[in-house]
From Swiss-Prot:
The lineage of its organism: Bacteria, Bacillati, Bacillota, Bacilli, Lactobacillales. Signal peptide: none annotated. GO terms for molecular function: S-adenosylmethionine:tRNA ribosyltransferase-isomerase activity. It comes from Pediococcus pentosaceus (strain ATCC 25745 / CCUG 21536 / LMG 10740 / 183-1w). InterPro entries: QueA, QueA_dom1, QueA_dom2, QueA_sf. The gene is queA. Its EC number is 2.4.99.17. This is S-adenosylmethionine:tRNA ribosyltransferase-isomerase.
């Protein structure tokens, strides 16, 4: 049966889109879903510890969101530009989204702030993408911290008082254009409790890129082309995960970015987990054969998105749509600053 984008649609009341983070990260709600039976339980995120067993591994993406949105003016004419950094190609060369794209022709020079940072458009890409080369004095990330702002998703209309609330407590590798949001619920204290229970904490890196902002345009989901994102799994993390597998523990992924990294590696090495880095455009959808992940934490995703499709690949389409309907009836909060699910 060919699945269409419409098969992953659902009606979400606008007021359930969370506009601000909840006061305490781990007091968000948690919908526990059994992927085989479809059985559900309403909990809070701090109850996650009861869902984890000694010998399991919790995998987290330690990518950090860059203050990736910067505003500049065109050299000579003074026209305004908004530039969103997507990923670092090499050195000072970046793939970006520039608005208005039509004014950013190859050779255009853009000035940011008082001129401490300038950029030249070197290549025009599809979807308003532009390759640009930056010029500055000092350390790029420090210059960016001064001039850039957090690129919150378009459905969040309120200003974020504390930018750290759009970072996970363990974020350390700058490079994402959006947060790996399932991880926003973890607190340092809760992670310590998890570790004390005999559960391994394992980190990987996937820099969240352009695809997060790109809807599925095709009716037939098979026609959708996924974006590429950079990932990295260290020798140490691979060894820890293999040890857990060997002892019969579960690999519990925090978020779709951790899932995509682990399943990319599992697909590449015939189900084995090895240290690896590279670019992934894996599209996990119903019919996918899972290689590594046994259970996962995830937020509630946008209708018709590739992320709903990924979750449906694990739970079955009917189970996940039923769970979303339950969450709507129970007034769970949706999307980046919303509540979480634990799917086992």
């Amino acid at each position: 049966m060919t699945l269409t984008t419409e098969d992953f649609n659902y009606d979400l009341p606008h007021e359930l889109i969370a506009q601000t983070p909840i006061k305490e990260r781990d007091e968000s709600r948690l919908l526990v879903l059994d992927h085989e039976t479809g059985a559900m339980e309403d909990k809070h995120f701090y109850d996650i510890i009861d869902q984890l067993n000694p010998g399991d591994a919790v995998v987290m993406n330690n990518s950090r969101v860059m203050p990736a949105r910067i505003y500049g003016i065109k050299d000579k004419t003074g026209g305004h530009f908004e530039v969103l950094l997507l990923h670092n190609i090499e050195g000072d060369r970046w793939e970006t989204l520039v608005k208005p794209a039509k004014r950013a022709k190859t050779g255009t020079k853009i000035i940011f702030g008082d001129g401490a940072l300038t950029a030249t458009v070197t290549k025009e890409l599809e979807h308003g993408g532009r390759e640009i080369v930056f010029d500055y004095d000092g350390i790029f990330m420090e210059v960016l911290e001064k001039l850039g702002e957090m690129p919150l998703p378009p459905y969040i209309k309120e200003k974020l008082d504390d930018p750290e609330r759009y970072q996970t407590v363990y974020s350390k590798e700058p490079g994402s254009a959006a947060a790996p949001t399932a991880g926003l619920h973890w607190t340092k204290e809760l992670l310590e409790k998890v570790e004390q229970k005999g559960i391994k904490l394992v980190y990987l890196t996937l820099h969240v890129g352009l695809g997060t902002f790109r809807p599925v345009d095709e009716d037939n989901i098979e026609d959708h082309k996924m974006h590429s994102e950079f990932y990295q799994l260290s020798e140490e993390s691979a060894a820890a995960l293999n040890e857990v597998k060997k002892q019969g523990g579960r690999i519990v992924a925090t978020g779709t970015t951790s899932i995509r990294t682990l399943e990319t590696i599992g697909s590449k090495f015939n189900g084995e987990i090895k240290a690896d880095s590279g670019w992934t455009d894996i599209f996990i959808k119903p019919g996918y054969e899972w290689k590594v992940v046994d259970a996962f934490i995830t937020n509630f995703h946008l209708p018709k998105s590739t992320l709903v499709m990924l979750v449906a690949a694990f739970t079955g389409r009917e189970n996940i749509l039923n769970a979303y309907q339950h969450a709507i009836e129970e007034k769970y909060r949706f999307f980046s600053f919303g509540d979480a699910m634990f799917i086992k």
